[in-house]
Amino acid sequence: MIELDPEKIIVTGGEWARDPNKTDLFRHVEMGYQSDVKLAKETSSGPLQLPGFELLEAPQTGNYFAVYHQFYDNPFNVFALEAFAKWIHPEEFADYHPTKDFIEFHKEWMPFEYSGVFFYDPANPDES
């Protein structure tokens, strides 16, 4: 990854239980139904603490993002793809609003209300 120095980096995050008495092996971004923008912001730099990330340009230029890990194996992954499109090609997909669309999806189709944070752009935390 260091050799490739990607233009954009997207990490996943979740609500993985942590033991406060143990050091996390991999610090992650807190995301999901129980998270909020403040918590996502506080933990967003966690993955960047891994050795080598300081050598990459993407995090330094605002091209570092996080998405809810559990999108990987369910039909909601269409919302993750919407976020990826917006983050990778912001001009072409400026009219995409994954958080707004996921909220609307919950209102129309889910038996419970939307809560939490599922997409995080440290450069635009209010859009999370």
Please annotate each region the language model reported.
Residues M1-F76, E82, T99-E104, W109-E127:
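Binding-cleft/active-site segments that stabilize strongly anionic ligands or cofactors
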